[in-house]
């Protein structure tokens, strides 16, 4: 009995330690690049500055995909080059995903997007699955 108690206690302590060291997981949802991209990229940079181990996925759809297109710049401040900001965050482990339904609806091609962009069949489904199945927190800048 003493061995069983020791084993259970050791397992509980191990699980507790594992839970404390697990990285946070967050999905940033962007569906309007003009309103959310610059603020969202700044939020992500700050997020990683404070918690660098955080796993971050940026899911875009509708007008949110625009900042991931080749040569995209902030419409309010053309000095802000999205490509450089996205590449810097990608180098820190951030994933950027573009909705393929949006591509079809807007007659866009994958080749029009930054090499840092990945593609997902549905942005909305991807956000839901990251939250429900993979335990990601949700942020909409």
Question: Positions of the model-derived regions?
Answer:
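Positively charged n-region of N-terminal signal peptides that target proteins for export
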Residues: 1-4
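Bacterial N-terminal signal peptides
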Residues: 6-16
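Secreted/extracellular ectodomain signature
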Residues: 20-141
